[in-house]
């Protein structure tokens, strides 16, 4: 995986899926992935529109890198964390797309409803997510170790 062309790939995959008789499509992206390829949201006036909900997990940077060895480096935040402060709502407005800010997990099914290309934003705390990720990894490692004993 990576961030180059992910939005454009999701749009193309959704269009292919729907051309093949499939229904709506969904893409789950991080905020940096969206920002890196936000031009993929800008479709020409003659281009078909996918029925695609793009869900953006926004932790204001590269939260996935918090679990790597370099997370303790003094320049981690500047080089890997890369906080941006960009509004996903404004990205949606520039592309003239519907936007939903999701506050509660229970509201996700409703937030995914709609037609056409649309953005759903879920804001998370990067540090809390890193702690949760570590706890889940530890629990999985312990369960696997218990299984092989």
Residue ranges of each PLM-predicted region?
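Thiamine diphosphate
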Residues: 1-149
């Amino acid at each position: 995986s990576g961030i180059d062309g992910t939005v454009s790939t999701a749009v193309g995959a959704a269009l292919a899926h729907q051309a093949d008789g499939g229904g709506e499509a969904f893409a789950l992206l991080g905020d940096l992935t969206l920002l890196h390829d936000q031009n993929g949201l800008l479709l020409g006036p003659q281009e078909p529109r996918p029925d695609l909900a793009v869900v953006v997990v926004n932790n204001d940077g590269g939260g996935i890198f918090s679990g790597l060895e370099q997370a303790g480096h003094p320049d981690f935040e500047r080089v890997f964390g890369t906080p941006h402060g960009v509004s996903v709502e404004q990205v949606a407005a520039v592309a003239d797309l519907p936007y939903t800010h999701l506050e509660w997990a229970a509201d996700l099914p409703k937030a995914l409803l709609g037609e056409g290309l649309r953005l759903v934003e879920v804001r998370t705390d990067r540090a809390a997510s890193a702690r949760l990720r570590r706890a889940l990894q530890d629990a999985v490692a312990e369960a696997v170790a218990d299984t092989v004993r």
